[in-house]
Amino acid sequence: MKRYILFLLALLLFAFSSTAAAGESVNAAVAANFMQPFKEIAKSFESQNSVSVVATFASSGHLTGQIMNGAPYDIFLSADEERPAALSQKGLAEKPFVYARGRVVLWTAKKELCRVSGWQEVVKHPSVKKIAVASPKVAPYGAAAMVALEQNRLRDTLQQKFVYPENIAQAFQYALTESTDVSFCALSSALSEQGKKGCYFEVGEAPPIVQGGCVLMRAKDREAVKKFVNFLNSPEVNSIKNKYGYK
């Protein structure tokens, strides 16, 4: 009988612990360009708090569509300010905040292209047959790259060479695997360990990317989400963001 009672107590304790742990989580929708720093940030946050962080990485436009269709995210970290603001105006999110500022660069794994001077000369180089640009309709970094191309009157002349992956992380992977010769990508990708396998060129004409986030109204564990949002602006996280070229 004593063993049976102890068993029941252990079972109840396990059930209580499991229930508590299940509620201590943050479900984040994160723009693909921020994937590398976010993984480090989440790992550090989890090590300091009894909260698990689950992330989905995709283009900002794709994630916005999921949120509007009822996806159970707690927080949205976009690659622009417009989408979080739109969600807030629709009553789906709290007031937006800025969590990072990023830049577009041109990246290549091809050593011969690394010797060329300037991104404009690289994309016009005879050996460049395919150029990865994240879909401008759903990826803010792709839209910014198009601004730079248009300013240099290169968009129309290079149109046949463009390949449009859905998000900026995929665009980088295309060039990394040499499925394309070059890629317009986030500086964070160029500064990653994989990015060091090639070289990158500054694209000064591309507007800076101001990245906004928001806490969604359907967030379940609001206390955990609040902790995470505060953590995003901590000196430790700022150091991680700076390492990947964000301000």
Predicted regions located by residue number:
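N-terminal hydrophobic alpha-helix used for membrane targeting or insertion
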Residues: L6-F7, L63
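Bacterial N-terminal signal peptides
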Residues: F7-F16
